[in-house]
From Swiss-Prot:
GO molecular function: cysteine-type peptidase activity
Keywords, ordered alphabetically: Autocatalytic cleavage, Host cell membrane, Host membrane, Hydrolase, Hypersensitive response elicitation, Membrane, Protease, Secreted, Thiol protease, Virulence, Zymogen
Further comment: Only naturally present in strain JL1065.
Protein name: Cysteine protease avirulence protein AvrRpt2
Post-translational modification comment from the UniProt entry: Autocleaved inside plant cells upon activation by cyclophilin. Cleavage is crucial in subcellular location and in eliciting HR. Inhibited by cyclosporin A (cyclophilin inhibitor).
C-alpha cells in the first residue's frame, strides 16, 4: 500500500497580539509598578526617622491643646481613661515633622491610674502607669511605706527613693545644667524611653509626681497624666520648667 505524503504548511505564526489581551498586559504592568512602589516604600521606611513619620501620620491626628492661665489647674484633653489596668494595645506615636509642620509627640499607650483617696499615693500611682505601659504584673513599689489605713507615706528620704528606683527598675534622666528643657529635648526623651515620671511643685505649692506623656510645640505645652487630677492634661512648657524639682537628681525617672 502506498501512503500519500501529507503537505504541512510551515508558514510562520502571526506576532500580532489580539486586541483583547491589551488590558491584561496593562494590568500586569500596573501591578508590577505598584509592587515596585511598595518595595521602594518598604526600603525607605527602614530608618527610624521615616518609621516615626509614618507612625505619626497613620496614628496621630492633630491635637489642639488650650493653654490654661499661669498658675491654674490644667485642662483635660479627654475624659476617656482607664482606672488601673494596662492598655491592651501598647501603641506609641512619635515625633512628627517635616519643615512645614509643628512637631507633636504623644504616647497613646500609657494607662491612667488614679491615686484615689491616698493623700501621699502619687508616687505609687505613677509607678503603676509607667510599669503597666511596658509590662503586665504587680508593681513592687515600697510595701514598707504602706502602714496603717491612711495609705502610703510620701517619699521623704533619699534612701526610700533609692529603694523605689531599684525595686521598679527606674533610671534617672540627666537634667540639663541650665534647668530648662526644650520641646525637642523632651520629645527625644519620650521617643527613646517612653513615659517619664516627674516630680514638681503644684499650684498649691505641694510636691507631687505625675507622668509625662507628650509635647506639643504648636501650643508650647506638655501632656501628662496626673494621679490626682486626671489623664491627658496640658501644662505650658514654661510652667513645667519653672516647677520641676531641679534640686534633686531623681526629678525625672523612666523604665
Amino acid at each position: 500500500m502506498k501512503i500519500a505524503p501529507v503537505a504541512i504548511n510551515h508558514s510562520p505564526l502571526s506576532r500580532e497580539v489580539p486586541s483583547h489581551a491589551a488590558p491584561t498586559q496593562a494590568k500586569q504592568t500596573n501591578l508590577q509598578s505598584e509592587a515596585g512602589d511598595l518595595d521602594a516604600r518598604k526600603s525607605s521606611a527602614s530608618s527610624p526617622e521615616t518609621r516615626a513619620l509614618l507612625a505619626t501620620k497613620t496614628v496621630l491626628g492633630r491635637h489642639k491643646i488650650e493653654v490654661p492661665a499661669f498658675g491654674g489647674w490644667f485642662k483635660k484633653k479627654s475624659s476617656k481613661h482607664e482606672t488601673g489596668g494596662s492598655s491592651a494595645n501598647a501603641d506609641s506615636s512619635s515625633v512628627a515633622s517635616d519643615s512645614t509642620e509643628k512637631p507633636l509627640f504623644r504616647l497613646t499607650h500609657v494607662p491612667y491610674v488614679s491615686q484615689g483617696n491616698e493623700r501621699m499615693g502619687c508616687w505609687y500611682a505613677c509607678a503603676r502607669m509607667v510599669g503597666h505601659s511596658v509590662e503586665a504584673g504587680p508593681r513592687l513599689g515600697l510595701p514598707e511605706l504602706y502602714e496603717g489605713r491612711e495609705g502610703p507615706a510620701g517619699l521623704q528620704d533619699f534612701s526610700d527613693v533609692e529603694r523605689f528606683i531599684h525595686n521598679e527598675g527606674l533610671t534617672r534622666v540627666d537634667l540639663p545644667d541650665n534647668e530648662r528643657f526644650t520641646h525637642e529635648e523632651l520629645g527625644a526623651l519620650l521617643y527613646k524611653h517612653g513615659p517619664i515620671i516627674f516630680g514638681w511643685k503644684t499650684p498649691n505649692d505641694s510636691w507631687h509626681m505625675s507622668v509625662l506623656t507628650g509635647v506639643d510645640k504648636e501650643t508650647s505645652s506638655i501632656t501628662f497624666h496626673d494621679p490626682r487630677q486626671g489623664p491627658d492634661l496640658a501644662m505650658p512648657l514654661d510652667y513645667f520648667n519653672q516647677r520641676l524639682a531641679w534640686q534633686v537628681p531623681h526629678a525625672m525617672l523612666y523604665r
